[in-house]
Each structure stands twice: as C-alpha cells, then as structure tokens.
C-alpha cells in the first residue's frame, strides 16, 4: 500500500543501511570501512534520499574501524545536509555504539543492549612465566606525570 502525501511531487525516500556483525579490519562477514564505503556512499547519493537510517546490531570490535566508519557517515551527512537516524535492534555496544553516535538521533527498543565505548579489553597475563624467565617490565618516562603508575621508573 503506497502512502500519498498531498502537495508533494514525490514521496520522500529514506535510505536504509544495515550494520550487522562484528567490526574488524578484515574477514568475510565483518564490518569495516573498506567494504562498507561503497554502500555508505550509495545510501547518501542514490535517489536523493531525504534521510539515512542506520539499522545497527553489533557488539562492536575494532576501535579504528568503528572510528573510520562513523567518520565517513558523519562526513557524508554533513556534506549532503541529510539527517541520519540510528535504530538499534538487539545490541549496539562498544564500536556498535560508536556507529550509533554518528547519527543525529538514536532510537532503541527497551530490550536493546546499549553499551559504552571501551567496555571490554581482553588480553593474556604471563607475569609469572616472565618472572621465571628472568624478564621484568621496565617503563621509562621523561616527565614527572607521564605515567599513571607509581611503580614505573622515572628517568
């Protein structure tokens, strides 16, 4: 069923860009600036849209790729003078949230999981192994307050 708006020659078009999955520099099925660039460009240019909608369902991932994608969206929105609306489905955490804040407005379901940027950082601890091998951590700084740790050595 078509919606008709009186006095408009053409019904406004809203481009929809689905951003679903993990954000990472490479790999199939992952969001990154290189693979998304043509789709983002198309969303802002094809058919002269009145707005762009981002449908986001991402737990996040690479901070660099999140920044590049968000910057591309914001740059095109500003250049084309188009509003951007983010609609969060299940999750927009960490880098997914970063993508959402590139929009002018964010819409979420009460059941959506919304997370902060930098929620999780994972790594491996090998301090005991390193001590057994005779290795120790050394940090050198040249200014009094450069390092936040009182255990660090000052030069």
What are these regions (language model features)?
Residues 53-76:
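Extended, non-globular alpha-helical segments
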Residues 142-150:
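Conserved small/polar residues in nucleotide/adenosyl-binding loops
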Residues 54, 99-100, 146:
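Hydrophobic alpha-helical segments that mediate membrane insertion or helix-helix packing
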Residues 27-50:
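A short, well-ordered alpha-helical element
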Residues 58-60, 76-124, 130:
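Glycine-rich beta-to-alpha active-site loop
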Residues 14-18, 35, 51-55, 87, ...:
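Structural motif
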Residues 1-19, 123, 151:
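Intrinsically disordered, low-complexity segments enriched in small/flexible residues
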Residues 10-34:
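STAS-typified acidic loop motif
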């Amino acid at each position: 069923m078509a919606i008709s708006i009186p006095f408009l020659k053409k019904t406004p078009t809203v481009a929809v860009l689905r951003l679903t999955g993990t954000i990472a520099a490479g790999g199939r099925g992952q969001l990154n600036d290189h693979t998304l660039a043509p789709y983002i460009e198309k969303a802002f240019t094809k058919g002269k849209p009145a707005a762009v909608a981002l449908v986001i369902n991402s737990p996040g991932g690479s901070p660099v790729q999140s920044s590049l994608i968000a910057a591309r969206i914001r740059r095109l929105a500003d250049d084309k003078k188009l509003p951007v609306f983010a609609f969060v489905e299940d999750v927009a955490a960490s880098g997914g949230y970063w993508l959402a804040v590139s929009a002018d407005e964010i819409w979420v379901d009460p059941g959506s999981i919304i997370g902060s940027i930098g929620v999780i950082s994972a790594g491996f601890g090998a301090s005991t192994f390193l001590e057994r091998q005779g290795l120790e951590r050394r940090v050198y700084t040249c200014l009094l307050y450069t390092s936040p740790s009182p255990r660090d050595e000052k030069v």
